[in-house]
């Protein structure tokens, strides 16, 4: 019992320290007028593919930077750098999530005054990422049609904390036989207050709604308004 209490106390201390650092990140981001978006999902849900399209299509409209978290390799960072955006790769080693201290270190690689939007592509994980505030304004959860209709019910904490849930790879919906009404219902059950979008980075379907959402949230940041209403 003593050991269990010690573990709980250590975890609470770690999360408390992370919360302090996240608050400092948030203060710094707001001083620069930045909209910061934390993108989370399981591996393979399409985070990098969506960011590739976003960087291409919003070039000249928003100044975008990206921080990419992975256990190993800089593959995703190189893909995004090819789109002309400033990108910093965060290699976490064995850590299954990003934390506020990693973001603070990565911030030093950017000229934040030259950015409008900062995307944080979190490590592909549906559990740990939900617990760590990074200083972001918005939490976006991606969920592909290939993952099964009940994914939101199996991992409710992540979905419950989302401001926006994006159903990705909708061009594959018919091929995989997914029950889209069930997908929507399960998202709504776990994330009743979240906005829901459906899109395909491959075909382009639904991307305009994503871009409109981003631009509206950026306007709110610059005007000091609340997000994701």
Feature map (PLM): residue ranges:
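Generic alpha-helical hydrophobic packing signal
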Residues: 65, 116-117, 163, 209, ...
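Short acidic active-site motifs
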Residues: 76, 154, 206
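Conserved C-terminal guanine-recognition region of P-loop GTPase G domains, centered on the G4
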Residues: 129-136, 143-194
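Canonical P-loop GTPase G-domain recognition
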Residues: 172-229
